[in-house]
Amino acid sequence: GANAIGVISEEDKRDFVMGLGAKGVINRKDFKCWGQLPTVNTPEYAEWFKEVRKFGKAIWDITGKGNNVDIVFEHPGEATFPVSTFVCKKGGMVVICAGTTGFNCTFDVRYLWMHQKRIQGSHFAHLKQASAANKLMIERRLDPCMSEVFPWDEIPQAHVKMLRNEHKPGNMAVLVQAPRTGLRTFEDALER
């Protein structure tokens, strides 16, 4: 398995991430290297580069000096992509599956080709893989890290919690045509 390092933006998520088995946690708010890459060879780039190296040192504090990460699982996109491509180890890979902070990703291409790094897009799964993942869920072999479940008529409250960042760490779900949690199949959900 992997030795995961969680990157958080709120300290109250540290214990949650460590409880999931992370080897370590880094708070992104301790660094000022987020957003699109500044123009190379400018004072802004030099400042960005200093901060990225600080972030890399925080990784080394967890992995050991000189041990960069094999894979960066990149979700935010625009705001974090330049850093992800830098901290990934030589021959490593950045896997990107979304762009929640934006789709216009920038990076210093020199660190890609000189260190033979790879960028891989991922859209979760094809139909057969999605079916296999659903089977694992039904068999309760995966933990969805569920923090809260809302009945259908409370969807607006769930959205307000997310908007205000008041939701608990983990995933939230909504009951859709299910009377209660814990039901595993369509047949279980049928009221008899």
Question: Over which residues does each language-model region extend?
Answer:
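Conserved helix-to-beta-strand junction in the class I
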Residues: F86-C88
